[in-house]
Amino acid sequence: MTPFACFLTGILVASSLLHDAQAEPCGARAQEPIATDRPQIASSSIVVPCGSLQFENGLSATSAAGQRTFDLPETSARLGVFSKTELRFGVPIYFQNDPTTSGFVNGFGDFSLGFKQQLGPVKGGFDVSVIPAVSLPVGAKAISSHGYDPSVQIPWSRAMTKTWTAAGMFSVSSPTQGPRRNVTGQASVYFDRQLTQPWDAYIEYSGSFPQRGGPIHQVDCGMAYKIAPRQQLDLHGGFGFSAASPDYSIGIGYSLRFQAFRFH
């Protein structure tokens, strides 16, 4: 059985088991405000409401070692299938590189498929989730990893006051680089401040530690503004402070959520 088939089988088995544990009618949380993975590096620790379909989109510009890259649409589709379970689909991103003699080319990246299972709230008031995923090698020849690359993320969050939240994520991935995999650990932490009811700002540190190659240390900050209860605009920027890190990155995004189905 291929890794992709194993992954799909795991999703189906987990979904069937979780269905029996459904605690509320699907659609009961449809009116809750939107909560996105954007624009932080760390993913959100909560799932989208059951029956809701959420699209998160963006455009970024990154400069690294003299090479500037634009990428879009950064689309992530998240479908709530149970009260604490969502399916996740990462649409291939198009990378546009400035012309250089370094051999960089333009094209689409790989597609990703995964799910999020919310475990919290747990002891201590933490919200915690686990996000297994795998990328599928459908991208351009010079951009795709040409492998089925698994990853697991564990995002967490905890409200400190009515307006301050601490959050972060631990993850491990195994991307294909050339003939081998390069197992990479990652950790991030950020602090979010609710400025007004629809407006949040944050600052975040993220570190990636590959098995081969130097560590990537980054600091980013940004804000998100809910133009409607289930629509959001975001803006972010950051910089690296290690040899392997990007010099800087900036980006904008737009996300929306709507109710796709209901059942009891």
Language-model features and meaning:
Residues 1-3:
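N-terminal secretory signal peptides that target proteins for export/translocation
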Residues 23-264:
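Transmembrane beta-barrel domains of Gram-negative outer membranes and organellar outer membranes
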Residues 14-25:
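Bacterial Sec-dependent signal peptides at the C-terminal "C-region" and cleavage site
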Residues 5-16:
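Bacterial N-terminal signal peptides
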